[in-house]
Regions:
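N-terminal entrance/gating region of PLP-dependent enzymes' catalytic architecture
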Residues: 3-147, 434, 453, 464, ...
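Conserved PLP cofactor-binding pocket of PLP-dependent enzymes
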Residues: 412, 417, 439-456
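Active-site C-terminal subdomain of aminotransferase-like
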Residues: 253, 272, 297-402
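Conserved PLP-enzyme active-site core in the AAT-like
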Residues: 126, 159-331, 498
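Conserved PLP-binding catalytic core of the aspartate aminotransferase-like
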Residues: 408-436
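Short beta-strand-to-loop capping motifs
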Residues: 324, 420-424, 459-461
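PLP-dependent enzyme catalytic core of the Aspartate aminotransferase-like
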Residues: 449-498
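Short loop-beta-helix segment that forms the pyridoxal 5′-phosphate
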Residues: 138-166, 215-218
């Protein structure tokens, strides 16, 4: 026995993964932090995005690293091969998708969370109280009752899926979790607009209800769900035996940022006894802006709301969130008894409702900390002003487009998304988008509206200024002229000074 103990002790000598020289580690850590801060502070000196050279991709590929490497060498690889070729959404010229720019504050909070290495699946510790505090703040902002529940998730795609599952359980009862959806589940029907994000259809698929069970309702002239058409579709489905159980309204559609008439949809859902969910991935946080909040009238009547703090909230990725009006219905959709998850009257396992009772994950990172730091450090008033500013910049871009005969506005500007094109064919505009991205000047994206290829600018970065909008317009005119055989140099109209 003693020999076994001695052999075991020998095998675990120096088994800790902590640094052998903390002073050396501290110096390198400070250098990493300083260089990361420098990268954010001097972001304008870099291209928004740049293509990844084949050599860089090849340099990252290697066999399984069975032996140790010096941390400094690993960091060198990161600094040379990873950091310069990121998505680019820290840069103020990034306007491709609704990606928040992050903040230095959020970066520090992420580091602190990693230092704690807390699992927020459950048990009794203060990191969970931080998450619960944010749930309380969201209840207050959206005028939800004290009994409402909330949980952090990866993003709104997951939050929408979870909302579908909560609504499904509310419609079929908890036995459906044990026995499956059965014949009753096969008759469930959900509704959203044709302009809704594709993740809603995907949620129906993953939930086992099928994408065909999602009725995509036409939009009106303002690109909002046609409430009259929605009412008619619900009536038609009931007539042939379907059970309408869910309506997903959009607070900021993916293509142009339109907000459905939430109050009218809420009223219809109340009359019909249907779960009313709002996909507010980015638009829901307009609640922080006094001038934009009225656009969300009716969101306070929702049964559930999905949103992303990593979009307009500027929290580093990822930080999605689901808020549910009826906390007990939320719990019934996910809670599962297990001996290893038993609750005790005292000790580390104390508590009643744990986050794992409100979602599918037992292993959960401390997403709430960077959100808590962001909300506490900047305050909701300042974040609301940033959100309003991004919408003002979108209107500025709209004015630039309307003042330039070579550009065409393709949709009304509702919030922070602008869809337009160079007055040429789709092929030219498709090349223009790629040209601009590869130039590093800006990073727009694209979509298709009414059969036309559109250049899509989604302004979500708190660092973006009018000069960045001017640079985008100038780039579109320059590359559009080159691709269409026109003039290559264009002086942009000086609307910024007006």
């Amino acid at each position: 026995m003693n020999e076994i103990i001695r052999n075991t002790q020998s095998s675990v000598t120096n088994g800790s993964l902590d640094p052998q020289d903390w002073s050396e580690f501290r110096a390198l850590a400070h250098r990493m932090l300083d260089e990361t801060i420098d990268g954010i502070a001097n972001i304008r000196s870099r291209p928004v995005w740049q293509p990844i050279p084949d050599g860089v991709r090849a340099a990252l590929k290697s066999d399984v690293p069975r032996g140790a490497s010096e941390l400094a060498e690993v960091y060198r690889e990161f600094a040379e091969h990873v950091a310069p070729y990121a998505t680019g959404n820290v840069h103020p010229g990034f306007m491709g998708w609704v990606h928040g720019g992050g903040t230095a504050v959020g970066m520090l909070a992420e580091m602190l969370a990693a230092g704690l290495n807390a699992n927020l699946g459950g048990r009794d510790h203060m990191p969970i109280e931080v998450e619960r505090q944010i749930v309380g703040w969201m209840r207050s902002l959206f005028a939800f009752p004290d009994s409402a529940s909330g949980i952090f998730v990866t993003g709104t795609s997951m939050a929408n899926l979870m909302a579908v599952l909560v609504a499904r359980t509310a419609a079929l009862g908890t036995l459906a979790r044990q026995h499956g959806i059965g014949n009753d589940g096969a008759l469930l029907a959900a509704y959203t607009s044709r302009a809704a994000h594709g993740c809603v259809s995907r949620a129906m698929d993953i939930a086992g209800l099928g994408a065909d069970a999602l009725r995509k309702v036409d939009v009106d002239v303002d690109h909002r769900i046609d409430v009259a058409a929605l009412r008619a579709q619900i009536a038609a489905d009931r007539e042939i035996g379907f059970k309408p159980f869910l309506v997903v309204a959009s607070a900021g559609t993916v293509d142009i940022g339109a907000i459905d008439d939430l109050r009218a949809v809420a009223q219809l859902c109340r009359e019909e006894g249907i779960w009313f969910h709002v996909d507010g991935a980015f638009g829901a946080l307009a609640i922080l802006s006094p001038e934009l909040a009225p656009l969300l009238g009716g969101i306070e009547l929702a049964d559930s709301i999905a949103l992303d703090f990593h979009k307009w909230g500027q929290v580093p990725y990822d930080a999605g969130f689901l808020l549910v009006r009826d906390g007990e219905q939320h719990r019934q959709a996910f809670a599962q008894p297990a001996a290893y998850l038993s609750r005790e009257a005292r000790g580390l396992a104390a508590g009643t409702v744990w986050p794992c009772d409100l979602g599918p994950d037992l292993s959960r990172g401390f997403r709430a900390l960077k959100t808590w730091f962001t909300l506490k450090t900047f305050g909701t008033d300042r974040l609301g002003a940033v959100i309003a500013r991004s919408c003002a910049l979108a209107k500025y871009l709209e004015a630039r487009i309307l003042a330039e005969p070579r550009l065409e506005l393709l949709a009304p500007v509702n919030l922070n998304i602008v869809c337009f094109r160079y007055r040429a064919g789709d092929a030219v505009n498709r090349e223009v988008v790629a040209d601009i991205q590869e130039s590093g000047i800006a990073a727009p994206s694209s979509t298709t509206l009414d059969g036309k290829f559109a250049i899509r600018a989604a302004i979500a970065n708190h660092r973006t200024e009018e000069t960045d909008i001017d640079a985008l317009v100038a780039a579109v005119l320059k590359f559009g002229a080159q691709r269409s055989g026109g003039v290559t140099e264009v002086e942009a109209p000086p609307l910024a000074a007006q």
